[in-house]
Amino acid sequence: MGLYQLFSDIVDYPNFHLSAKVKECIHILSSRKDRAATLLEEFQAFFEETSLNRVQEIFTKTFDLQAECSPYIGYHLFGEGSHRAMFMAGLKESYRMVDLPLTNELPDHLSVILRFLETSSDPEEKEELIYLCLVPALGKMLDGFGGEGDPYQRVLESLLIVIQQDMETKDEKVSPALELQETHHGG
């Protein structure tokens, strides 16, 4: 299973399989020399100390009750309106082209977009979706946390590091995510 699929599962509603997904993601990331694995290890420690019901409550509070941390990427880019609707229609078409099964989630949900990134073989479409949509939306979501108290902040920070490094590796250029990452980590 690839990293984007694992992160997709991690940012989806928590279930009994979450711990295994986080551990697998940490295992894959442990070969990298960055903070991504450490951030997920902190999240894993939280998960192991906390009941599943409590993790689900925190997930709901974080992503469903705070607009700043909404997992709907189109909302962060366009707000509610026709531009978001067009964005979602485009995503649905892209998903259809790679036979990505649609879930009960809207097409601009972070977990669905990550599943698509895992599935798609079109590097230009993936790069466009990452640079123009995912990185700016993740930046807004991270800004919405306002502190270090929410365990899901670590997950999103780890995801941003992974995305930024993957894109740098692919095209050997500094991505906008590097500046965004430095903004959130103080350099």
Task: Show the residue positions of the predicted features.
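Charged, alpha-helix-forming regions
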Residues: M1-L110, R115-G187
